[in-house]
Structures are given as C-alpha cells and as structure tokens.
A protein has these predicted regions:
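Conserved hydrophobic positions within beta-strands
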Residues: 29-31
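Gly-rich Lys/Arg/Thr-decorated short loops/hinges at beta-loop-alpha junctions or inter-strand turns
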Residues: 57-61, 109-123, 203
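Short, Lys/Arg- and Gly-enriched loop/turn segments at beta-strand edges
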Residues: 14-26, 40-44, 59-61
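Histidine-anchored nucleotide/phosphate-binding helix
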Residues: 128-145
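Short, well-structured beta-strand-loop connectors
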Residues: 2-14, 33
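Acidic low-complexity segments
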Residues: 33, 38-89, 94, 103-104, ...
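Hydrophobic alpha-helical positions that pack around
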Residues: 148-207
Length: 207
C-alpha cells in the first residue's frame, strides 16, 4: 500500500496463476503510488507499484542463502526459481519454473550462445563475464529436467568465449561446447536444434 516501506528482494506482487510469476522490489524505499504504468515489452498499461528509493539498497530479511545445488532436490530448485519470480528475457516474460518441469522426457539441453542479429555482442559478453554462473545454471537445469547432456552452442567468431567455455566444461562429463558457423539466423531456436541435433521441430511445434 502507499506509504509502506519496502526492501530489496521483498515480494510486492503475488503470482495470479500457473503461467505467472511473483514480483519483487529491486530497491529499498517507500511506496508512493499503486497505479497503471506502461509495461516495457507489452506495450500496454499494467498495474505497477511505484517506489521512491532511499538509496540504501537494504536487503529484505527473506533474502537468505540456500543449500548447495548438490543438496537441493529438483522440486526444491524449481520452487526457489518460482518464488524468485525468474522469467525469460525474450519479451513474453514466460515463467522459468514452468520450463524446468517439462511434460515430456528431455534428453538434451541446448544453451543458446548465438546472437539473434549480426553485430550484436550481448550473448558474447555474458559468456565471457558470467561463465561460472552459466555452468551453475546449466547444472541446475540438467538436474531439474533429468536431461543427460547439456550443450553450449557458440558461433565460431567468438573464439575467446569458445576457449573459455571449453576450459570450464573440460572436466564435466555431461556438458560440451558446440561451435556453430556464424550465419544468420543461427540463433533461432528451431534452426539451432536442426544444426546441432539434426532434429526438425514440426510446424507449429515447440522445442
């Protein structure tokens, strides 16, 4: 409500259904309004909590360390992701927790490190600067989905990223790096699946 004090990581919006995610405050401060605001990717107004930051970035008490990945069960990992409100970055905001529990068996996870457009370097920089986080995340996905193998796909014009990720997976038996030709639209998911796995996703089907 208006006037409430909130902290970083505090839940300020509950998930309203299965295909939805909770919202958390990214700052500490005071709620100054609850009103419709333009959504960044939807192009329409949604109800928003407007917070005036106090500049302190004080963490909420609910933000606590979890058990190690080896100690967590697949269901516990999915619940953590769900409660954290993690969603995809493709614009639709699809809840990641739903993808971590596929309806059908999955044998391979493809980590798409190919840019979606020529001259972009977003995925390239993520691979270079967050390599350990990527490996950790892929381990978590393999555990929750039950997939036997994780393949990190990188275009051949990113040699430094290729070398770094190959070094990271060298002693991990269920991970490997696939070097793909730098060719548009290599980053499109169905194109990538056919290139790496030799499998064709049917028209209208989802990978």
């Amino acid at each position: 409500e208006v006037g409430d004090t909130v902290k970083v990581g505090q839940k300020i919006g509950e998930a309203a259904g299965f295909i939805s995610a909770p919202v958390h405050s990214s700052v500490s401060g005071t709620v100054v309004a609850v009103e419709p605001r333009m959504h960044g990717t939807r192009g329409s107004e949604v109800m928003a909590v407007v917070i005036e930051s106090d500049g302190k970035n004080t963490l909420h008490e609910s933000v606590q360390p979890h058990k190690t990945l080896d100690e967590l069960t697949p269901d516990e990992i999915i619940e953590i992701v769900k409660e954290a409100g993690i969603v995809g970055m493709g614009g639709a905001g699809f809840p990641t927790c739903v993808k971590l529990k596929p309806a059908k068996p999955v044998d391979t996870i493809l980590l798409n490190g190919c840019e979606c457009e020529p001259y972009l370097t977003a995925d390239h920089k993520v691979l270079l600067e967050f390599a350990d986080d990527i490996i950790f995340g892929l381990k978590a996905i393999l555990k929750t989905t039950g997939a036997e193998k994780g393949i990190i796909v990188i275009e051949d014009n990113k040699q430094d990223a290729i070398e770094l990720m190959q070094e990271k997976v060298a002693n991990i038996g269920d991970m490997e790096v696939f070097v793909a030709r730098t060719k548009y639209p290599q980053g499109a998911e169905k194109t990538l699946i056919k290139r790496v796995m030799g499998r064709k996703v049917p028209s209208g089907g989802l990978p």
